[in-house]
């Protein structure tokens, strides 16, 4: 308990010292460059890293986060998660994107490359690029046996680069959110290979309100993070097909992935994946 409190105090003091330098959360503007942070092949970029939550946890107490993902302490996220500031989180459009990170300036750093997934947001003006990592991900950058010592550093310099996501053996999953009903449909999209993030989702009903085939894609709206919704003026006719577009413009269609007897708070695994 004392060690855990000590690590939190160190992290808080480190962040406060940075905020003093920058003035405050409303102080001097940070020079963001979204394109550099989200581009592949940009090489290693400098960033600062902090951590939050339990020392060996996934970050949020509920194992979720602003992106809407659930159980990020379990496979395939496996607690290797991070908040991103604006160039990384991108108002939710960066949810699910994958980054390699490493540190070598702190004596406890191993220099080994680790991969994290963006599942949450943190807009404190700590640096141009800021990763607020889970305790697990932060400690993973340490030399063997020095995980806690590195976490006690509170805030460290790291390097990062965007990389394609890879979920071996998994297809894209759609989780129908609690509260969905015949005229309101909300879905979480997860486990996308390559870009990992989604910038648009469209829904096609199996038939129109008048009984005929539609063949019409209706754009859904981003609720927050990786959750997309459709507010309808009529009872939606399932099964539904879903079309998703990734950050790089690739499109996939999951035909009839949401069955006629769908229910809220349920997972529906597709048979499609980006490649």
From Swiss-Prot:
Expansin-like EG45 domain span: 64-170
Name all Expansin-like CBD domain ranges. Answer: 183-270
What kind of membrane protein is this, topologically? Peripheral membrane protein
- Function statement: May cause loosening and extension of plant cell walls by disrupting non-covalent bonding between cellulose microfibrils and matrix glucans. No enzymatic activity has been found. May be required for rapid internodal elongation in deepwater rice during submergence.
Which cellular component terms (GO) are annotated to the entry? Answer: extracellular region; membrane
Renumbered to this chain, the signal peptide range is 1-25
One annotated GO biological process: sexual reproduction
What is the recorded name of this protein?
Expansin-B6
Keywords from the named record: Cell wall, Cell wall biogenesis/degradation, Disulfide bond, Glycoprotein, Membrane, Secreted, Signal
User: Where in the cell is the protein located?
Assistant: Secreted, Cell wall; Membrane
